[in-house]
Regions:
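A substrate-engagement module of RecA-like helicase motors
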Residues: 218, 233-244, 303-383
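Walker A/P-loop
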Residues: 271-293, 305
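Acidic two-metal-ion nuclease catalytic site recognized across multiple nuclease folds
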Residues: 158-238
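Post-Walker A helix-loop "phosphate-sensing" segment adjacent to the P-loop in P-loop NTPases
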Residues: 297-303
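Conserved pre-motif I regulatory segment
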Residues: 230-278
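Acidic, Mg2+-coordinating catalytic module of metal-dependent nucleases/exonucleases
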Residues: 83-102, 124-194
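Conserved non-catalytic scaffold segment of RNase H-like nuclease domains
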Residues: 1-109, 115, 122-144
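Alpha-helical scaffold elements adjacent to nucleotide-binding pockets in ATP/GTP-utilizing enzyme cores
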Residues: 53, 57, 98, 128-132, ...
């Protein structure tokens, strides 16, 4: 089934108020899927001086629009170019608010790449058009002009559509189901993505439904030994010494005597069942100094070892970098899990409550779609 014809557009204006400010440039592109079908562009004379900040942003000067037509003469052309097709834009309601003052495009469906991106790129830190283009690998033009921004908008929409197609079918179907009573600017894209995969639904290979948050089946836990075997602190220290396992594994490994002394102190504390309070300065290599004996103790004696950190950033570093390095250097099978404070995790009860009550407003739908996509594609643990 072919995709619908869409018209992406962008305008440049003298300000932000559609009742007081005026349009100075319009750019529009008609497209269907990956195929571009036409472009429309015009400068407009606003009948007033263009503010300095707008000149700096767009490069459009009073001289450039001095002989340009007025909006009243060109808006009918734009209306004919767009027709009844849905209008795509980034924060598109801003553009449409100006155009509807001119009494055109009042009934066209609005498709907004902002909520679409918010849902499909749940971990992005910024959602302005330039930031999205950079994140998606889209080349940005040198100028901030209407037709240039429209081309970027088309590329962003097409890329996000492919992202929607790649969603798990259950997630895609649930988003479409939840958005039925809400116009949030992303309805058309998700409906088209689900329609494009309708054959997969019909074949029975997957069925729509809710994302499961049931606990996963884990392998058998550790079986602790009755009498723990003490650690060989000298053998562990050798791993960190010149020519040891770490030096062989890491090209830029640097031997640090303070690190070895700390490792031995930690190993003795494990072996003797005592507390140890150790102060070590920056550059000591503290992580390996306590992780090496901790890992060896866990594997050797079948006991869990808890490492409590002061920051989440250090937790992430240990789990994603240091623990795998220790496992590789020691050549042991090591399982590690990350446990954060309760406030760092999604509450399944609240999520299910939001699903049952269904979103009533666009912002509610955007956040719920964002969470569902995040659960399906970004996080294995809901944190």
């Amino acid at each position: 089934m072919s995709q619908p014809t869409l018209v992406a557009l962008d305008i440049e204006t003298t300000g932000l108020d559609p009742q007081r400010d005026a349009i100075i440039e319009i750019g529009a592109i008609r497209f269907r899927g990956d195929r571009l079908e036409g472009e429309y562009h015009t400068l407009l004379n606003p009948g007033r001086s263009i503010p300095r900040n707008v000149v700096d942003l767009t490069g459009i000067t009073d001289a450039m629009v001095a002989r340009a037509p007025r909006a009243i003469d060109k808006l009918p052309e734009l209306e004919a170019f767009v027709g009844d097709d849905p209008v795509v834009g980034h924060n598109v309601r801003f553009d449409l608010s100006f155009l509807r003052v001119g009494k055109i495009l009042r009934y066209n469906e609005a498709v907004d790449t902002y909520p679409i991106a918010s849902a499909l790129l749940p971990t992005a830190t910024r959602y302005n058009l330039g930031a999205l283009a950079r994140q998606l690998g889209i080349v940005l033009p040198a100028t901030h002009r209407a037709l240039d921004d429209t081309r970027v908008t088309v590329a962003v929409y097409q890329t996000l559509y492919q992202r929607a197609l790649a969603l798990p079918l259950k997630t895609l179907a649930e988003i479409v189901n939840l958005q039925q009573d809400v116009d949030w600017g992303a309805n058309l894209l998700f409906e088209e993505a689900l329609r494009a995969r309708s054959r997969e639904l019909a074949s029975g290979r997957a069925a729509p439904g809710s994302i499961s948050l049931e606990p996963r089946t884990l392998p058998r836990g550790l079986v602790p030994v009755a009498e723990p075997t003490p650690l060989d602190d000298e053998a562990l220290a050798h791993l960190l010494e010149p020519g040891g396992a770490f030096a062989q594994r890491f090209a830029n490994y640097e031997f640090r005597p303070e690190q070895v002394r700390m490792l031995k102190a930690v190993a003795r504390a494990f072996s003797e069942g005592k507390h140890a309070m150790i102060e070590a300065g920056t550059g000591t290599g503290k992580s390996f100094a306590y992780l090496v004996p901790a890992a060896q103790w866990a594997v050797q004696n079948g006991q869990r070892v808890v490492v409590s950190t002061n920051t989440i950033n250090l937790q992430e570093q240990l789990l994603r970098k240091d623990v795998p390095d220790v496992e590789a250097a020691l050549k042991i099978g090591l399982r590690a899990a990350l446990l954060k404070g309760r406030s760092n995790y999604l509450c399944p009860r609240r999520l299910d409550n939001a699903r049952r009550h269904r979103p009533k407003q666009a912002d509610e739908m955007r956040v719920l779609a964002k969470v569902l996509t995040w659960l399906a594609t970004e996080t294995p643990a809901g944190d």
